[in-house]
């Protein structure tokens, strides 16, 4: 169901099918988050569902407003009809959709759910979530920004949101002692890079964002998978208890070190490019 929801989101040609995709992702994510039935996982799953339901309600309001204003939900048709509407109407519609998609993408200040939810799930589930779930939200923002609202009315807002997401995410990561929570905050920070690229409203900015999305899917997924191996080897994900792990398991250390360098943008890795 999760894979079908992701595929449908990337292939959707109208807002309603995109909404259905988001709901498929929500249902599958809740099951995967709460697998095992521990109190922490159930709490994280309920928190994630409540935040996602708020996003769904806002998205539904945006869909209703879009249909009322244009008479269609097809993205290509809307792109044409929105050109004839007053700027206030299009800006309001874009703002509503941005809030809905921003929650899915974990854009600050709508990102607080992510660091609380991801670390509680099993490592393979967290890896899939890190690689795909937030990227669906970023993709939805790209579709809305480039196809329906190319005028750049809210570019300044997007740019500020991107900058704040970068800063808050990395400051949150610095304060963590659990490596899974550290990576979760780092994930939020890197979402900010993607949003900033979209806000530039240039072909170079958009192509850079798409490249960075692909890079981040590969690197962040790898890191969460390796952290799962580290947790299994050491019995904990706390940095305080992982001292000497490199000497005890040099292969794991290398497996973590290489994608970490990549994520940090160290040349010649793809994160630097």
Model-derived regions: residue spans:
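Short, ordered loop/turn segments at secondary-structure junctions
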Residues: 20
């Amino acid at each position: 169901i999760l894979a079908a929801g992701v595929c449908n989101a990337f292939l959707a040609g109208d807002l309603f099918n995109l909404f259905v995709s988001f709901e498929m992702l929500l249902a599958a994510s809740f099951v995967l988050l709460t697998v095992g039935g521990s109190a922490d996982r159930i709490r994280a799953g309920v928190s994630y569902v409540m935040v996602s339901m708020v996003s769904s309600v806002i998205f539904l309001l945006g869909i209703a407003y879009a249909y009322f204003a244009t008479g269609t939900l097809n993205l290509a048709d809307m792109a044409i009809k929105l050109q004839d509407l007053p700027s206030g109407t299009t800006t309001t519609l874009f703002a509503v959709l941005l809030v809905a998609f921003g929650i899915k993408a974990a854009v600050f200040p709508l990102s607080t759910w992510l660091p609380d939810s991801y670390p509680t799930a099993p490592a393979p589930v967290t890896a899939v979530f890190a690689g795909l779930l937030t990227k669906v939200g970023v993709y939805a923002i790209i579709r809305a920004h480039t196809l329906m609202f190319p005028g750049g009315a809210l570019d300044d807002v997007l740019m500020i949101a991107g900058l704040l997401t970068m800063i808050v995410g990395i400051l949150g990561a610095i304060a963590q002692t659990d490596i899974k929570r550290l990576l979760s905050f780092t994930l939020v920070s890197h979402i900010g890079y993607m949003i900033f690229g979209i806000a530039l409203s240039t072909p170079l900015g958009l192509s850079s964002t798409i490249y960075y999305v692909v890079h981040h899917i590969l690197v962040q997924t790898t890191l969460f998978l390796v952290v799962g191996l580290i947790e299994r080897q050491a019995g904990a994900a706390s940095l305080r208890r992982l001292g000497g792990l490199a000497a005890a398991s040099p292969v794991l250390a290398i497996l973590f070190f290489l994608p970490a360098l990549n994520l940090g943008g160290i040349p010649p890795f793809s994160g630097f490019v």
